[in-house]
């Protein structure tokens, strides 16, 4: 996961932490550090990590699988960091995915044109309660991620964007499926499960061995389980 997080970002090794920085966004979810497995950071390591983000005017954050570095979590808490959230992580190994076809009347396609990419983004933004005025720069960023090996799918109903999802470029056999979204008028039809299955099949076919995602809640966990994902531990997010 460290290699995957570093893709497309600048990095700095700070003690036992790999700090990653987005080149074009201050979004906290795009700027975070990951401790080495079994890391036992000193207080000076934690101070240096805090400073690495503070001098860039970024929120100091870490994200990692809790069981891989329990001492790191404790050291951060002692230094005044706080747990933002704990998120269950689910995995779908090759051979475990369930084929779920698109529901009747639903078209699944890889977005290629600007219109298709924008349609996917609008559906995602709307589903997650964000403003749907998608700037051209976001369309181009998405296109660049696809050119760099990322994955995406757009769900349409009668030509209208209904939902979508993405997966990161595969790094060392690992990728994350994310952004699974369905607009309110099209929910409870099985579109979310079909989108997830489409992306999962695509990354497996491209050689991914470790495919993971983080469900937002119990309903999402149930949906992903239908596709073949199983619980694999918790991701912890901390910030200062």
Q: Predicted regions span which residues?
A:
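A short helix-loop-beta-strand connector motif used in the catalytic cores of GNAT acetyltransferases and
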Residues: 3-10, 58, 72, 84-86, ...
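Conserved GNAT acetyl-CoA-binding A-motif
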Residues: 56-65, 203-216
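A conserved beta-turn-beta hairpin within the catalytic core of GNAT-like acetyltransferases
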Residues: 25-32, 84, 169-177, 187
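A conserved beta-strand-loop-helix scaffold within acyl/acetyltransferase catalytic domains
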Residues: 133-183
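Conserved acetyl-CoA-binding loop-helix of GNAT-fold acetyltransferases
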Residues: 42-51, 178-184, 188-205, 226
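Acyl-donor-binding surface of acyltransferase catalytic domains
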Residues: 40-115, 238-240
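Conserved active-site alpha-helix within GNAT-family acetyltransferase domains
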Residues: 69-83, 193, 217-234
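N-terminal charged segments
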Residues: 1-55, 68, 73
